[in-house]
Amino acid sequence: YSVTRQTGSTIKPIGAYALGIEYGLVNWSTMLNNSPLYQKQDMVIRDEDYCRKNGLMGLSDKQLRAYPNAWRSWPRNYGGNYGDNSDIPLWNGLARSLNTIAIRVGDLVGASNIFNFVYNTLQLNTLDPVNDVGLAQMVMGSQTHGVTPTALAAAFQIFYDGQYTTPHLYTRVLDRDGNIYLENNATSYQALTPDTAYVMNRLLKNVLYSSVGTAGGRYPNSNGMESFGKTGTASDEKDLWFVGGTPYYVTAVWWGYDAPYDMTKTLGKQQAKTRTCVMAWKALMEQVQADLPYKA
């Protein structure tokens, strides 16, 4: 729970989407274009594979402009497609975890605003203040070190009522006479407005309950209580995530190796993308909530 890993797409809701709604820049049904933010001809993003194969890695961006094929469109969606250039509603893009949609929201919000929010307000302080202030890091989740499962779970608690409480393992320790021996004064504060938290909660419900969601149909059966969540896959499928919330709990599930390794080589691409982490979370929630009373 204390090892840092790249977040992949799990950072999208706590940064770009939450702030986009909080700032009034987007809403549930905002139409966004399903295409790369930067096209190859814009010469903004290097094609590192091409540059490496052709001995161009040492060239500056200015020098590289002489090589049109040294650039690529960015970003791609999971699986390598660049979208279909259609306009789709925000809720659909989030449910499907489309990078092409999230990056447009992130561009509206601004990478520095996202970083300041997740680093300072949500206390994801293992992020790098020098190297992680960019759209690739703040929207796509390709950070220098990443964050811990504990910190990521704590960040997602804001989607209940907008409040953030610092993670803690105990509240107090009493001696045998009932006197307080140790007290852990956790800090709580409002990170988002309740209205934004509610909209985000409903948006993230689609990940589990919509037929287009990346974890569609894999919500826990817990006495009719609803859930929300977000899948995540880091670069080269070395880190798999699911962060899910219920009216009682927020839980982060990370799946990977101590020495990072492509999980699709052992699990298969579809299993790695959509099933492993969310099914572990689903089984856990059904067990721990089995005897709990209904809570909205």
Language model regions located:
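Conserved catalytic neighborhood of penicillin-recognizing serine enzymes
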Residues: 25-114, 135, 176-206
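Secondary-structure transition/capping motifs at alpha-helix termini
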Residues: 21-30, 125-129, 161-166, 291
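Structural recognition of the beta-strand scaffold that forms the well-ordered cores
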Residues: 31, 92, 102-106, 117, ...
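Solvent-exposed coil/turn segments that connect beta secondary-structure elements
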Residues: 23-24, 37, 248, 258
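Short active-site loop at a secondary-structure junction
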Residues: 1-14, 29-31, 137
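Short, charged, amphipathic alpha-helices and their helix-cap/turn boundaries
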Residues: 109-127
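A glycine-rich, coil/turn loop motif that links secondary-structure elements
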Residues: 129-146
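A penicillin-recognizing enzyme superfamily signal
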Residues: 1-3, 7, 145-296
